[in-house]
């Protein structure tokens, strides 16, 4: 069967212009105009999606099939082009019957054109074919427009759904244009409003806990650039002005305290000859406290010295992915669970803004994994937030899973974050030694987010940084009172 792409090529119909008109009309629709005004960050993300729309429309037109009636009419037209005028005259009745049978828009006009001329000349033959071609072009253009209109309605419906989702989550997850773009890409999945309302709920909870939000931001910024002195610095010459007392006798201007032996007052010099005062003399000499004559003529001169020039290279510390392990034991339920989930949501926000990855592992008796920064990040976040914390505590398995993940090349610069109350058994010696090796050899950093003031110091000593957020009732009341 004839494809629409082939028909467009045969009739020289430009579908590109039709596609551009459709996209312009879509972007100018009132729904998008209101959305762009309300969420300007997402405007750039949607605009960046236009090439994908354009390619999808091209593919749709390319694969579309032409209706059988139009295909048969096109074939008849092509055959008629090959006929000479005498042959065309012979075939004309069959051509008119075929057009009538196919309900072609050209059928009635073709018969009127033939009836208006008693003789079929070569010029009439050419005119007949030209008008027939125009009729086919109109039909092909109409078919293109119908398909594009169907695609426009479908695309507009999809965009509206994604706009609704992105508009709800933009205040929670999009901190800049980069995050807005990644959020828009994630919104392509099939999600119901009831699903992503869970993210909205924890986003509102996070806003009610500004200390927890600031803690996540501090952890995200913890890798700062540091200056590294260079060992290969060369010696360079520096000029400096130094003051030296004149060595020739000059006019006495007064007295001063100094260590100038040549200008000592006689009483000071006399103390040097007294045994009991000799040490006192030397003390005052070292401290430049001897009374001396002050002379005119102290001179300044330029002195040339050589010293190594201090150059510093700024070693930009890479902000790698987050590998977050969350304790889902029973002691982490209730308010602790809410804080842990909201903290992970804050890390997801940072990861989207800084183009980092955010990988969540829930540890209890087994380990469940979620990647919140991937193409299915919103769906993964919803599944994570739906989890209930009712398991046991197996901190050793958590560390083993982290260390296994850090062996991969794509995670070599990751920051490991463990969220727990750290009320657990001590870590095995092999786990402790392996963590210290990763810290020493590969400069991996382990962060602890302590949800309790009663965590075991022996466990927490292994971490590079400990971020404390006490969820006890007293601490919660104090934080609320300070706000």
Curated annotation (Swiss-Prot):
Domain of life of the source: Bacteria
Gene3D superfamilies attached to this UniProt entry: von Willebrand factor, type A domain
Keywords of the record: Chaperone, Cytoplasm
Subcellular localization, as worded in the UniProt entry: Cytoplasm
Annotated Gene Ontology cellular component terms: cytosol
Coiled coil (residue ranges): none
Free-text function comment from the UniProt entry: Component of the RavA-ViaA chaperone complex, which may act on the membrane to optimize the function of some of the respiratory chains. ViaA stimulates the ATPase activity of RavA.
Family: Belongs to the ViaA family.
Entry-linked HAMAP family: ViaA (MF_01626)
Subunit: Homodimer. Interacts with RavA.
NCBIfam families xrefs: PRK10997.1
UniProt name for this protein: Regulatory protein ViaA
Natural source organism: Escherichia coli O81 (strain ED1a)
């Amino acid at each position: 069967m004839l494809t629409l792409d082939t028909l467009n090529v045969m009739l020289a119909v430009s579908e590109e212009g039709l596609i551009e008109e459709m996209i312009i009309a879509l972007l100018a629709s009132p729904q998008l105009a209101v959305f762009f005004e309300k969420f300007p960050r997402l405007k750039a993300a949607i605009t960046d999606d236009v090439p994908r729309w354009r390619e999808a429309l091209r593919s749709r037109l390319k694969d579309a099939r032409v209706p059988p009636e139009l295909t048969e009419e096109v074939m008849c037209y092509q055959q008629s082009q090959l006929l000479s005028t005498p042959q065309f005259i012979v075939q004309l009745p069959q051509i008119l019957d075929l057009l009538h049978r196919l309900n072609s828009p050209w059928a009635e006009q073709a018969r009127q054109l033939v009836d208006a001329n008693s003789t079929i000349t070569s010029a009439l033959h050419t005119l007949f074919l030209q008008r027939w071609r125009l009729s086919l072009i109109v039909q092909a253009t109409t078919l293109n427009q119908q398909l594009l209109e169907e695609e426009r309605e479908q695309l507009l419906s999809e965009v509206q759904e994604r706009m609704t989702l992105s508009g709800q989550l933009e205040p929670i997850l999009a901190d800049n244009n980069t995050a807005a773009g990644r959020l828009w890409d994630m919104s392509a999945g099939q999600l119901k409003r009831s699903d992503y309302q869970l993210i909205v709920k924890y986003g509102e909870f996070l806003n009610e806990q500004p200390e927890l939000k600031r803690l996540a931001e501090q952890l995200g910024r913890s890798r700062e650039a540091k200056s590294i002195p260079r060992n290969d610095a060369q010696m360079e010459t520096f000029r400096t002005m130094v003051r030296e007392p004149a060595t020739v006798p000059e006019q006495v201007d007064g007295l001063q305290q100094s260590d100038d032996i040549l200008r000592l007052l006689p009483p000071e010099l006399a103390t040097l000859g007294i045994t009991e005062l000799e040490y006192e003399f030397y003390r005052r000499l070292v401290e430049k406290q001897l009374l001396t004559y002050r002379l005119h003529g102290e001179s300044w001169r330029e002195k040339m010295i050589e010293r190594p020039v201090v150059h510093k290279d700024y070693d930009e510390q890479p902000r790698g992915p987050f590998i977050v392990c969350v304790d889902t034991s029973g002691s982490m339920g209730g308010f602790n669970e809410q804080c842990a989930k909201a903290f992970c949501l804050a890390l997801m926000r940072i990861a989207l803004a800084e183009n980092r990855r955010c990988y969540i592992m829930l540890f209890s008796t087994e380990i469940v994994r979620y990647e919140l920064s991937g193409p299915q990040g919103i769906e993964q976040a919803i599944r994570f937030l739906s989890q209930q914390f009712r398991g046991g505590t197996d901190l050793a398995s958590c560390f083993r899973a982290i260390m296994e993940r850090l062996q991969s090349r794509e995670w070599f610069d990751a920051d490991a974050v463990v969220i727990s109350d750290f009320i657990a058994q001590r870590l095995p010696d092999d786990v402790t030694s392996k963590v210290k090796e990763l810290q020493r050899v590969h400069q991996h950093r382990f962060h602890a987010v302590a949800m309790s003031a009663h965590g075991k110091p022996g466990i927490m000593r292994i971490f590079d940084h400990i971020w404390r957020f006490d969820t006890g009732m007293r601490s919660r009341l104090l934080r609320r009172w300070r706000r």
